[in-house]
């Protein structure tokens, strides 16, 4: 146990405590990523004589590192989500998919064309590409929020789709409380289960009785994500789910999605999030789609500029 002193009034204390928590969580997260990389290297090359010195060096390095510990109040409460219903093995097929948007000046813009691919059960896919490449548009098409201009999307057998975007928050009923909103997503659940889910998404105590209309953007995001994960959905389509979320909320969401046994495709600029989650990458570039059969680190290796010998 340790005592931390704050030189200021109570408002200053609250602000400063939050800043320190964020800094500690950021340091913890960086260290966890570094430890994972080192442990991965040791696991991959531990049996190779040619790498013996490097492996031993890294083992010693890990032994000397002082682990960052989070105080108990910052540890994430885990919620055991119900197993989603099993879908067919082929979750979503894209055949020659194209999309053209009509611009305000009545001209047209082709976003992408001829996209073809298959999303299979239990895949967790990152959808990448530069800004304006059409990532959000593709997710809207997959979720049935807009029709493709060409080609087809075929959703597989027993697939239940859940879609999250920044506009999802606008659909919440501002007069309902957090608890009532989450309860509506899981009507058969008792009050204890609902409160546990709210707590897992950082709504504790009186927070569950707040009306949605007074929540911040990040809090509304957490409500929508809690509702999505409470429902019996087995194909999640997520457009920037970590926007507006602080570090602790992102850890909560990451833990929930790592537990999730359904299928997932998402857009996110959070590389740590993608590294920790996805096992396949779809990249949209100049209206076409490339598919990378590996995790996010594999994708980064493939697209990294090649060093040309001078």
Where are these regions (language model features)?
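ABC ATP-binding cassette signature C-motif
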Residues: 1-26, 75, 81-310
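ABC ATPase nucleotide-binding domains
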Residues: 22-40, 44-46, 51-60, 75-76, ...
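Generic structural signal for alpha-helix termini and adjacent loop/cap motifs
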Residues: 45-48, 68, 144-145
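Generic structural signal for well-ordered, non-transmembrane alpha-helical segments
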Residues: 60-63, 92
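Amphipathic alpha-helical coiled-coil segments
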Residues: 64-73
